Amino acid sequence: MTDKPRKRRKRRNDRNHLVYKLTCAVDGSFYIGITFVDKGKKEKSLDRRWRAHLRNALDYGKENLLSVAIRTHTPESFTQEILHVVRGKQACHDLERELIQELRPHLNM
């Protein structure tokens, strides 16, 4: 058996990432988060991340503020919004941190 050369994976820090906002229509509280853009499909990537938040809240019973808000107000009361598309993981983390400090979202605390 011959060893095949391994394909190099694309570095994750070179991908596009999203900074997104989840807003509860009931009380106006919101959450700022990030996720990577999968195959250039921004909305699909945000939907994938939203489903992960729902699993954490509804299936796994997580106790973070976002999960508690999802259980309290129902998933239908939340809207999703893409705020920025950023090239690179670190740049996206930096922007997320800045927005959280600036906007003080209740569900991130």
Locations of the language-model features?
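Structure-specific nucleic-acid interaction/processing domains
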Residues: 2-109
